[in-house]
Amino acid sequence: MPRQRAPKEEEAELLTKQERSARSSEDASDTSISSISTTSLVLEHINDPAINGTSRSRRGEKYTDEDDEAQEAFDVEGGRYKSPISVDKKTRRWLWIVGIACVTGWALALVFFLMSGSYKHVSTRPHDPLASSTKGSGKKITMDDVFGGRFYAREQSLKWIAGPNGEDGLLLERDAGNAEYLVVEDIRNKGDGDSSAKKTKLMQKSGFNVNGYFVRPVEVWPSKDFKKTGEPLDPENQDGRVQLASLSPQSDAVVFTRNNNMYLRKLDSKEVIQITRDGGSELFYGIPDWVYEEEVFQTNSATWWSEDGKYIAFLRTDESTVPTYPVQYFVSRPSGDKPKAGEENYPEVRNIKYPKAGAPNPIVTLQFYDVEKAEVFSVEIEDDFRDNNRLITEIVWAGKTKQVLVRETNRESDILKVVLMDVEKRTGKTVRTENVAELDGGWFEVSQKTTFVPADPANGRKDDGYIDTIIHEGYDHIGYFTPLDNDKPIVLSQGEWEVVDAPSRVDLKNNIVYYISTAKSSMERHAYSVFLNGTGTSEVVENSGSGYYGASFSAGGSYALITYQGPGIPWQKIISTPSSKDKFEKVLEENKALDRFVREREMPILNYQTIEVDGFKLNVLERRPPHFNEKKKYPVLFYQYSGPGSQEVNKKFHVDFQAYIAANLEYIVVTVDGRGTGFLGRKLRCITRGNIGYYEAHDQIAAAKIWASKKYVDADRLAIWGWSYGGFNTLKTLEQDAGQTFKYGMAVAPVTDWRYYDSIYTERYMHTPQNNAAGYNNSTITDVASLAKNTRFLLMHGVADDNVHMQNTLTLLDRLDLAGVENYDVHVFPDSDHSIYFHNANRIVYDKLRWWLINAFNGEWAKIKTAEPKAQVDARMERR
């Protein structure tokens, strides 16, 4: 289930002493004496009216330069001018004595302050390196700032590739500037004065003319020798629509899909060879159907070349038994087809093969094509899953061995099989089976990070093997399986933390594995390396401090593109890895313009913390208004997503709608990653299985009660909102809470009944409805009487949502109608899908959320409960 589309997502020490931190100590200050250094206290308050004798303006009054009569005597620039008074020697001597005594006293006080424990290091403060705490320190964040991309961090579009002769450190750079669209460059030359001459230019411009048409590439693949020239893929059908194209590893052939059939073009010939012939509207070759693209591959490719280019693996997808869901378009015609005469005023209907929970799934089988023999074949497995109980989630060629690893699960995603096939012998066997239903009652997430490790006896690797994610003592880690049919791994990482999309790269020369993990904090990401024997774990970036880092590694593992994503201003640099002989470091992006823009804005204070609910520690992010005052009472908005394995509380730099609410409207915004979310271990994650919505809602309510008890929170003004799964959990929370804690809620594109959502996602967490009818009933939003006990809630949905169908909101509205519940508002968006973008809709969503929330916290929705005509109110007042 994808999240809503919001402003791009997606504060710590920098990696080198030469680089400045994103926010210096002069920029971040607290009003609490116990949480700042005495030095900053003195410097900050030199001009404080309470110290120098001037009077403060009363709370609520705007700052003005026109001070009263009593103030003028103390002002030099703004007050009445008075001639300076001369000071004699005796007076100056006494001033020196008093000054020295003051400095001595201050020094003694500082020593006492530090020794007494009153001083708190910066790490103990709320994590707010970019926050504004000085009144009038900047401009307010606006909606135009957020949605206009002004807080977007620049990232250079780079991709590591291997050189023709195995060179390491080559970058494929897209849109590189200097009128060059696509270039290959050695990173060691990047930025040099004469680097332009050392670049290999693959494409000068971003497009070109073909037979009178201007063509722009959607994707590019460099040939192995960087010397291929552009020409039509199919000379006989140059204008034909191509659904997918894939270049062979040797850059000598292209396999492509057209009209759901597969074709092969060998580049030394103009001939196009048709591989399959029975593809059609319900049978696909080499590309996934809707549910596999959405929930498994998240791409339109289901085609895999062998490393030697002699075989092609591909999926055959038969969705003939999958039921159809109609999506209606009332304003536009996405197909581009002209309506038939007389049907101009009817909506266009797009019929999607959409398997809902419990419905028939597409039948997916793995097939192979022998390029030399021009033959399609399959490999039979003795103990394979039945066709209607099999999900194929990953294909990995085992180097040049003509073997392939296939990852499969059962329909409910709790039994995993790793199958090893030999395409030359056309045999296969299951080499590894895991059952997490028996282990911890959980599930397997879809993953495509399995990495083949070839044998190299001279380098200590006797047999071929592969690296895969494993479950080790309740956490996701990485293991090395060797030989290929071994089901017992060498454990490469371990601890009460988890790896993330690992491994990132394997350095075969030095037997080093690189990966990203949450070892320092579940809210952070850092890069690590470990040897293939499981020893020598070390951090790739020394002294990285607190932060959220991404890393991509060169083909040979000698270089890494490090992307610091927050919480401070993001930056990018390329460094040499510890295994590299030559030390190298080059800053690519510092986002100086963004840094200046942020410093001119009043930013929210970010307070990262954990709370305990039912013995589980949950991550929380509290966003406070820039000039937070504990003596005030603030309304609180809870924003969450809460989906299985997701994470919202992380230390990325992210100025979004929530930041706007906190910084501009001056509401507190809290995000809680409750049970079921990711990166805190399987015990916390898998407890929700079979009953999603219960623990997620329970934890939001528990957190809300904690905040409601805080002195600075107005307990009568608590609201919650979310999109997609977050919309579902918003409604589930309001249903479970029944107005006791939360008074308001806003749900966008929510699931209201999991029987309406797609099979692969839903059954992973809920089993099938046939096997868990009670769980589905519990997870459905049905208790409308409890929803009626909330002050008010808001529903929004895109009419053309092909992901979370409008059916979800409409069936809930019907339940509300039947029960006579009316304390809600509804807004639907014609022709908008799950992201709600059509015809300015996305901005309208957030404008609606903003104004609706303001009215809620202003008490307007409470008045509606007893609304009556103004004339009647006036008449009643007159009678009194």
Curated annotation (Swiss-Prot):
Catalytic activity: Release of an N-terminal dipeptide, Xaa-Yaa-|-Zaa-, from a polypeptide, preferentially when Yaa is Pro, provided Zaa is neither Pro nor hydroxyproline
GO cellular component: fungal-type vacuole membrane; plasma membrane
Cystines in this chain: none
Residue positions with a glycan: N533, N778
Name assigned to this protein: Probable dipeptidyl-aminopeptidase B
MF GO annotations: aminopeptidase activity; dipeptidyl-peptidase activity; serine-type peptidase activity
Vacuolar side: 115-880
Sequence similarity: Belongs to the peptidase S9B family.
Protein's organism: Pyrenophora tritici-repentis (strain Pt-1C-BFP) (Wheat tan spot fungus)
Localization per Swiss-Prot or TrEMBL: Vacuole membrane
Keyword Glycoprotein found: yes
UniProtKB keywords: Aminopeptidase, Glycoprotein, Hydrolase, Membrane, Protease, Serine protease, Signal-anchor, Transmembrane, Transmembrane helix, Vacuole
Keyword rRNA-binding applies: no
EC number(s) reported in the record: 3.4.14.5
Residue intervals passing through the bilayer: 94-114
Enzyme class: hydrolase
One GO BP annotation of this record: proteolysis
Record InterPro entries: AB_hydrolase_fold, Peptidase_S9_cat, Peptidase_S9B_N, Serine_Prot_S9B/DPPIV
Compositionally biased region (Low complexity): 30-40
Region (Disordered): 1-71
Function description: Type IV dipeptidyl-peptidase which removes N-terminal dipeptides sequentially from polypeptides having unsubstituted N-termini provided that the penultimate residue is proline.
Active site per UniProt: S724, D801, H834
Primary localization class, coarse: membrane
PANTHER family tied to this protein: DIPEPTIDYL PEPTIDASE 10, ISOFORM B, PROTEASE FAMILY S9B,C DIPEPTIDYL-PEPTIDASE IV-RELATED
Topological domain spans for side Cytoplasmic: 1-93
Comp. bias intervals (Basic and acidic residues): 1-26
Bilayer topology annotation: Single-pass type II membrane protein
